[in-house]
Amino acid sequence: MDQQSTRTDITVNVDGFWMLQALLDIRHVAPELRCRPYVSTDSNDWLNEHPGMAVMREQGIVVNDAVNEQVAARMKVLAAPDLEVVALLSRGKLLYGVIDDENQPPGSRDIPDNEFRVVLARRGQHWVSAVRVGNDITVDDVTVSDSASIAALVMDGLESIHHADPAAINAVNVPMEEMLEATKSWQESGFNVFSGGDLRRMGISAATVAALGQALSDPAAEVAVYARQYRDDAKGPSASVLSLKDGSGGRIALYQQARTAGSGEAWLAICPATPQLVQVGVKTVLDTLPYGEWKTHSRV
């Protein structure tokens, strides 16, 4: 069978994506995609004169003057999801969208060259993925059945950038506030392994301090995974974020654990990034969403 005929994904640049928004009257999508907002006008006649329309007709994305039905259905999931799971992936240090370039034009929609971004959006039972790499966005249907399937997608994305084995460390839970304070002073010393005394006093082993220092100071690759739920016009983020860091000492996973009833203290898990523990991290992110069961929650 012709492989081209079996493909369902579409790839457009940021301008092409904005044209799809205009054709479907979609104001905005997940901010991580860094797309331009669309403001409705009285007439869309100008769209037919845009050179991008000819390209999208050639690709079958636009048929006559309407967006292909499958593409339109996916775009509508991205426009008004019940839930979004976001993964920011980077070769080297994750910059969280900050581009240090004084020549960057105001209002730029660029993302850092070393990053790519994945948004998994669900509306009802329809899951859609939008992946931004450089100036291009690829949109497709995606199968998500449980936290393990999301963890597998994240790990596949990270492996496409860089391979690392799980760090040879033991999993440990530490108080979040203490860890943040200790890491702040440790960072000032350049994550010198001999300056990690505060971490050692929290029960973190010397091997973990060494591997963590390498991953924090000079990561070969990083991922941050978090989620959002929507309810009417409100949105609520997950309380936990999963962070994966590849250092010379291997791949480490860090995530804030779900708070137990009656506990006022937040705890941070630091562990080797095995597939099983990455899945636990993803599940924790989803379990700390504010509006209930992530698989079935509806925004209305």
Swiss-Prot record:
Q: Which GO terms describe its cellular component?
A: cytoplasm; peptidoglycan-based cell wall; plasma membrane
* Phenotype of gene-disrupted mutants: Deletion does not affect EsxN and PPE41 secretion.
Name the InterPro entries for this protein. EspG
Annotated localization: Cytoplasm
Q: Which Pfam families match?
A: ESX-1_EspG
Q: In which family does this protein belong, per the annotation?
A: Belongs to the EspG family.
Protein name per the record: ESX-5 secretion-associated protein EspG5
Tell me which species this is from. Mycobacterium tuberculosis (strain ATCC 25618 / H37Rv)
Q: Which gene encodes it?
A: espG5
